[in-house]
Amino acid sequence: FMDACDELGLFVIVNTPGWQFWNDAPEFAQRVYSDIRNLVRRDRNHACVWLWEPILNETWYPDDFAKKTRELVDQEYPYPYCYSGCDSGARGKEYFPVLFTHPSFDGKAWGDPNADPKITYFTREWGDNVDDWSSHNSPSRVARNWGEQPMLIQARHYANPTYTYTCYDALYRTPRQHVGGCLWHSFDHQRGYHPDPFYGGLMDVFR
């Protein structure tokens, strides 16, 4: 995968394995630190690597853990243009040069109303808009076989909806320190927690 991204010129954010779980036993953090060292050593010579995300995604971890993960990345790749990032609301965010957030919409919706002009911002994932995590009652979740009109609603939601939401137009209008974002998701796919597929992608297996 990384070789293909190098060849095609696709940027990659390399994430540490782990999600929504923390264990206070000391060996848990030590194993995460080992994972970070190994993944940086594995991928540091790939041209496609744009950013490292060494913290555990959506996890309530100690503040000193965040600082240590940033230090580990810098130790394993002690060269210019080595960037690490985390969520703008995460513990230890002050240790990272890149923060993940949404455009602020003048403080009317998601985003960081206290954006720091010295920090680079990126929207790690945007687009999905649901009333619950199981249904498809959403302008962003549309199956291709539902027809043209639902697909146009989905396209408008992603491009420039009439309501306040992160979209292509909103990302285009951000100041230059906000360097873009990644749509969630690129393609329809099966979900492990529900029998119906996720229909929020720009593509499915047939297009």
Q: What is each residue range found by the language model?
A:
Residues 1-207:
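Substrate-binding/catalytic cleft of secreted carbohydrate-active enzymes
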